[in-house]
Curated annotation (Swiss-Prot):
Keywords from the UniProt entry: ATP-binding, Cytoplasm, Kinase, NAD, NADP, Nucleotide-binding, Transferase
Enzyme class: transferase
EC number annotated for this UniProt entry: 2.7.1.23
Gene symbol of the encoding locus: nadK
Active-site residues (renumbered): 67 (proton acceptor)
Function in brief: Involved in the regulation of the intracellular balance of NAD and NADP, and is a key enzyme in the biosynthesis of NADP. Catalyzes specifically the phosphorylation on 2'-hydroxyl of the adenosine moiety of NAD to yield NADP. It can use ATP and other nucleoside triphosphates (GTP,UTP) as well as inorganic polyphosphate (poly(P)) as a source of phosphorus. NAD is the preferred substrate for the kinase, but NADH can also be used as phosphoryl acceptor.
Location of the protein in the cell: Cytoplasm
Positions that bind NAD(+): 67-68, 72, 137-138, 148, 165, 167, 175, 178-183, 236
Family: Belongs to the NAD kinase family.
Catalytic activity: NAD(+) + ATP = ADP + NADP(+) + H(+)
Organism: Pyrococcus horikoshii (strain ATCC 700860 / DSM 12428 / JCM 9974 / NBRC 100139 / OT-3)
Protein name, as recorded: NAD kinase
Temperature effects on activity: Extremely high thermostability. Upon heating at 95 degrees Celsius for 10 minutes the kinase activity is not lost, but about 80% of the activity is lost upon incubation at 100 degrees Celsius for 10 minutes.
Gene3D superfamilies hit by this protein: Probable inorganic polyphosphate/atp-NAD kinase, domain 1, Probable inorganic polyphosphate/atp-NAD kinase, domain 2
Main localization category: cytoplasm
């Protein structure tokens, strides 16, 4: 059994806990590698165990941080590696374990007392080319000039779904429905569902509303504006695009895999949504 460790880089408590996890696994005889960026912020790991995140080839990743740490893992790893997520963030919609339960959770993982929670992702094509990371939460198309709306049409499976004048458009997975899409007026979607949410950002007029479509759908977005736009993936990756670009979003063949110890969705999600607001 081989483990990878990734920690939130700006929080000393997360880095120290990462080292304790590393030491625990090494003492118990497991092979462990550590993310290079984690090591650079806390250089106490054995240097021979340090590799770049995009080279991880392990059975499990222990992620110590918040949702941002998980998104970094998902954007950089090349394989769908199950993630045990330890919450060192704020709300931690994606995380599973509180820091005080870290070693109890590791023992359960080692004993095989867990299940894999698979989450869909979406893939983006820019003029037919896939050059950006898959999104676990959302793809956002945003105005490149604050205060200036963008004009676009979007099609679902070839049919015109809406023509929108807005600050942008969010295409979200169920996992991302508690994030940017919810701020745009979208609903909470149970993460077990195979659907995609499309939500305009501050549309004019307000007759353009969020819609939920089958996960198998293809969304084609065509710009009718003459100004630059910004493409944002999970709030982590950004690219400026010319006004005549065509963007296509589909469900990715890849999935995010989380280590879970309970199949309970409620009340965890509803409580955290209320905490957020």
């Amino acid at each position: 059994m081989k483990f990878g460790i990734v920690a939130r880089r700006d929080k000393e408590e997360a880095l120290k806990l990462a080292y304790r996890v590393y030491d625990f696994l090494k003492v118990h005889g497991y092979e462990v590698v550590v993310d290079k960026e984690t090591y650079e912020h806390f250089p106490h790991f054995k240097e021979g165990d340090v590799i770049p995140l995009d080279e991880f080839d392990v059975d499990f990743i222990v992620a110590i941080g918040g949702d941002g740490t998980i998104l970094r893992i998902e954007h950089m790893t090349k394989k769908d590696i199950p993630i045990l997520s330890i919450n060192m963030g704020t709300l931690g919609f994606l995380t599973e374990v509180e820091p005080s339960d870290t070693f109890f959770a590791l023992n359960r993982l080692i004993e095989g007392e867990y299940y894999i929670d698979e989450r869909i992702k979406v893939r983006t094509y820019i003029d037919g080319e896939n050059r950006v990371p898959d999104a676990l939460n959302e793809v956002a198309i945003l105005t490149g000039i604050p205060g200036k709306i963008i004009h676009m049409k979007y099609y679902v499976d070839g049919g015109l779904a809406d023509e929108v004048r807005a600050d942008g458009l969010v295409v979200s997975t169920p996992t991302g429905s508690t994030g940017y899409a919810m701020s745009a007026g979208g609903p909470f979607i149970d993460p077990r569902l195979d659907v995609i949410l499309i939500a305009p950002l501050l549309p004019l007029p307000k007759t353009s509303v969020p819609m939920v479509i089958p996960g198998s759908s293809r969304i084609d977005i065509r710009m009718l504006t003459d100004r630059e736009i910004i493409l944002a993936i999970d709030g982590q990756y950004y690219e400026h695009l010319p006004p005549n670009v065509e963007i296509t979003v589909v469900k990715s063949p890849r999935k995010t895999k989380f280590i879970r110890f309970t199949r309970e969705i409620y009340p965890k999600y509803t409580i955290r949504i209320k905490e957020r607001h």
